[in-house]
């Protein structure tokens, strides 16, 4: 009798039933109790469920069974057709709901949450910030309602064969690569405002999709295969303000039926280009005098010299208001998108001769991305403002962050030390290096001839053999030239500058040339954009020389004499000539110029210079290898990385003891 009273109380407090027991509302006040609140008799005919309260992994495991799928993804008898979670929240817990998958955050719909579930309509919790990867993979859903400001990860909606309607919120955060894939019944995608649409097939392989429409403000849309494999797509329409687009001839891929792309609102900046292999494509359509910055020959921008109509200024104000109305997102993409948009507003303000706008956006960029502002203000479109005190003051303030040669000139000087410091060593007799020399056939690669020619040939060989890939993951192998070479060949991959430099250092050491890979960093603490190059000792020149396998680059003086990094730094400071080899390049796809590579990139990254004291293969496979590094800094400069520091440049560039 007591047990019956308990069940009655639970149903009275937590469950509201229709006469047929098909529609149920449950308030899960204690995570993990959902199953207790839905007795077997209620579950049997349940088709519509509205949940409030907090759900943990155990609740989600049970919920999946109501949607016809078990813990191991086999089919079970579940009839649920509508699930309303709008007032529910997720509760981080250790209980697995599918295999080993758990609810790991209160604001993230976890991976595989609805995997293969059979439910007609889902209304997601309002508190969600992210729909994680594969959350709806292979789910038999027809309609899903997304919460405000949510972002969608890759493959979140992958291979959902019945999906007909995605009800987007008033403002979407980010739509990642491959977010909506293989949804064959989807015919129209209508988004409202959206912060960021990624390239790489954010909407892909939806065989019946005919129209993509964005009705609110668009923050940024990438320009590489953003929409792909959409054989029936005929139209893309932007009905609201567009703040930024990428662009290339491959911004769309395999969309053969596409006829037109329409901008029905103002456009701050676009680089959309003509699209290859679209036999039915007519053109881009945009409003006259409402595209402010265009890098596209297909979309006409406003003339830099004017004249401008009131409609143009009205459109610009609309873009400003749209940007300011964007909410704060719980998304890493917001910083990137905001930075690009502020840069665009700065340039557009200059073109419109809007000094107040220019100063406003310049100050915002100075706060958020100070390094960028100086290079932006050096563009010729700002020439008309030069000599005006407030503009000059802004530019001068930005100089200390973005004029890298000026930063070197004003940096603290080095100072000689009388103290005895640990010597740099070179492991010429390492058995690993002997193997590297033999199996990579380095003597054949270096060839005959003078020393400098041999040094260059080895650098060029590595540059050609393995591409530079700055975004690649760290390799899962021993960090010696032979294992890294094999790993790259077997996995058809490239390496970032660090591993290319480590490989080249091993090759030089194997051939008997003293060498170190050195990490060059900027003044800005936490700047991830450092660069790693090699310095190798030349007996002929009796000094170190600069070799960079990432860009097949070396630096000389005006007479063609090779320089080492310290000499390059000195010449940047005192203004003496520097020459970059004319064949310096990135993966044979784009050339590098002296202005780009030396004056900007390396000038930024020669503020501090770091090297290992012990130079041998696999040094960075070792735990606590940072204890073996020493960083050259100006006197009084605080370096927050690992290892020791020195301000004695003579010590840092000391000649090696030759074998």
Regions found by a protein language model. Name each.
Residues 202, 247-300, 375-395:
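Leucine-rich solenoid repeat scaffolds
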Residues 294-388:
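Alpha-helical protein-protein interaction modules
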Residues 404-495:
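Secondary-structure boundary elements
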